[in-house]
Structures are given as structure tokens and as C-alpha cells.
Amino acid sequence: MQFSNLDTLRTRGTRKWTQFDDDVIPMFVAESDFPTAPAIKEAIIDACEREMFGYTPAPHAHHLGEAVADFYDWRYGWRPDAAKIFPVADVVRGVLLAIQYFTDGDVIVPVPAYFPFLPIAEAAGRNRIDISSDKGLEGGLDMAEVEEAFKNGAGSIIVTNPFNPGGWMFTSEELDQICDIARRYKGRVLVDEIHAPLTYGKRHVCAAANNPDVCITVTATSKAWNVAGLKCAQMIFTNDEDVKTWNAINPVAKDGVGTLGIIAAEAAYESGREHLDWQVEQLKANRDWLVENLPSLIPGIRFEIPDATYLMFLDFKDTKLGVDKPAAYLLKHARVALSEGVDFGPGGEHRARMNFATSPEILKEATERIARAIEVV
């Protein structure tokens, strides 16, 4: 697979490549630098040639639900009911709708968290209850803390699996525990599985497989196939009452899905599997390179080795840098853009998130820039 160089990547013109000056290597927002899967490009080109630029096809005229169900069966060993899968603009919108229409009470958010989930409770007119996502060296939740939050009035918990920014994965036992707690307090478990296709060795576990009554799952092809701008995530419901609730929601609230997004998602799930496997292989190589080289390049650096995602949460507290906002320093002095740890909420101090979904050459250059900038502190 051929990688694009920085000059070519900048011509993409997306947020990643327009946020900063051209001398900055962007490794912040979760966009991949990998080439688009041929099956997706072919499907989009075909749709463009047919001038498929109008409103989304009628539900009976596309097969997105079947494509998602087949992919889940192949990748995770669990097949959801295709008739209970519905498109939604993006994962954040899906989680917001789940809070607004399917839950009561406060929202539990494990922090540090994917930063759009920090204000989502307020957007839904609810309060946020923070719990730590840093239990143990490899991340995880303290179930006593989860239960206490539900006991204190929470009606739902957002479970990002695989976790962003840490890159760790929930076990089947942990998911069942969370769901059992939610069930006891008549709460809901809102599961974000957007990074689930990108795992290294371990198989992703779907919380809803064992807990269809309390889970609402939201996923998308946005991260694994880099098509976030096409706007098509998927709500996966696993009980009939939730489907009835979804169908009763005002269509204005559910609007925003892109026609080309449906086309791209179907192509990704059905014909993008080989490309996905190649990406995972390359991402694992990038991750392993970082694990091997970061400690010598940046003495004192600490990090969780991600089991999934293309994101690594770096802790600079014991390096020569040792500031609360390392990304700001590195943007100025290394000309590398990372995501600031404090933007992920409490527990993000001294940390920064690195997106390593790029070529080995760009990854090496960016890491060496960071090392040089810290060395002269």
C-alpha cells in the first residue's frame, strides 16, 4: 500500500489539514492518513456518475442494516437484528438522542473522555456525573464508583468501547457488570463502538449481545474507513420498545444523514474488509514502533499500550517537559499538533493524545520532533 506524503495529504483540505500552518504535522483529530478503501471510492464515484445527490433513499431502497449486521457477525461474532438498525448523522448525535429520548436522570461519563461527550449531558438538559476511567495501569472503571453514581441519580452511562482516549477495551465480564448495575437502577448503557473494528489481537465484545434490554449501541465507519465527513452512523437497538421509541421521535431530530454516507458505509461493511485488515496490520506496526522507541526518545514518558484505536494517550509528567498542557508547548516548539489532555476532562493533566494513523515515515519524523523539543527544555 502506498502512503501519501505531507504535501499530498494537505490537499485533502479537511479539518486535520487546515487547522494549522503547513509546517505543523497534525496528529490531533481522529482522521487517518491512509488511502481510502478502493471499494468506497468506487461506490462514491458510481453514485456521483448517477448524480445521487438528493435526499437519502427510502429505507427499503438501501441495505445498510443488513450490511451492519453481517459485518458485526463476521468481526465480533454477534449478529444484531438488521431491522433494528437505523442511520443517524454521527455517533455524537446518536448518543445525544439516546440520552434525550431513552433515559432519565443524570449521565455518567468516565473521564478522561472523548471530549464531545463532556458537554453532551448539558446539551440534553441533564447533569454530568464524572467517574474515573483510569482504574489500574491499563485503564478501566471502578464498579463501586459506577454503582454509586447510579445510586445518586444517574439514569445512564456512556461506555466508549474501545475507549477513547486510552485505547483499552472492556471485557465481557466488565460490560456485564456495568449492565447489571444499570439494570438494578433502571438505567441505560449507551455504547459507542466507533473504534471497534480497529483492535490488535483481542476481539471486541459487544455489550448488547448479553444485555439487549439495557444497551443502546451507536457505531459508524468513520474511524476504521475515514469517512466522517459523509455523515452516516448507525443506531443499533436490541429490544422492540426502543424501536418503537425511535420510530416515534420527530424526524427533524433524527435528520442529517448523508446519501453518500449510506453508500460509503454499505461499501465499507460489505467490501472494505480486506482494506480494514491491512490498516489494522499497519496500525499495529506503528503502535509497536512507538512502544519500542518512545521510552528512549523521550525519557520519563508514560503511556497505556492501546489494545485498539489508533490513539495513544501520552503522559509527560515525568519528562523534562512536565507541564499541565504539553500539547500547547509541542505545537509551538516541535510543530507537531497533538490533542491536549485537559480537553478530555479531569485526569487529562500532563497528557496529550497522539493519532498514529499515518505512514511510518511521518510518525518517525513527528516523534523525533517531539523528542528534540523536549530535550532542550
UniProtKB/Swiss-Prot annotation:
Pfam families: Aminotran_1_2. The modification N6-(pyridoxal phosphate)lysine is found at K223. InterPro entries: Aminotransferase_I/II_large, Class-II_PLP-Dep_Aminotrans, PyrdxlP-dep_Trfase, PyrdxlP-dep_Trfase_major, PyrdxlP-dep_Trfase_small. Its cofactor is pyridoxal 5'-phosphate. It catalyses: an S-substituted L-cysteine + H2O = a thiol + pyruvate + NH4(+); S-(1-hydroxy-3-methylhexan-3-yl)-L-cysteine + H2O = 3-methyl-3-sulfanylhexan-1-ol + pyruvate + NH4(+); S-3-(hexan-1-ol)-L-cysteine + H2O = 3-sulfanyl-1-hexanol + pyruvate + NH4(+); S-(4-hydroxy-3-methylbutan-2-yl)-L-cysteine + H2O = 2-methyl-3-sulfanylbutan-1-ol + pyruvate + NH4(+). GO terms for molecular function: cysteine-S-conjugate beta-lyase activity; pyridoxal phosphate binding; transaminase activity. GO terms for biological process: biosynthetic process. It comes from the Bacteria. Its EC number is 4.4.1.13. Keywords: Aminotransferase, Lyase, Pyridoxal phosphate, Transferase. Belongs to the class-II pyridoxal-phosphate-dependent aminotransferase family. MalY/PatB cystathionine beta-lyase subfamily. Catalyzes the cleavage of the cysteine-S bond in various cysteine-S-conjugates. Cleaves L-cystathionine, as well as S-substituted cysteine conjugates S-benzyl-L-cysteine and S-ethyl-L-cysteine. Releases four human body odoriferous sulfanylalkanols: 3-methyl-3-sulfanylhexan-1-ol (3M3SH), 3-sulfanylhexan-1-ol, 2-methyl-3-sulfanylbutan-1-ol and 3-sulfanylpentan-1-ol; the release is obtained after the sequential hydrolysis of the Cys-Gly bond of the odorless Cys-Gly-S-conjugate precursors by the dipeptidase TpdA, then the cleavage of the resulting Cys-S-conjugates by MetC. This is Cysteine-S-conjugate beta-lyase. The gene is metC.
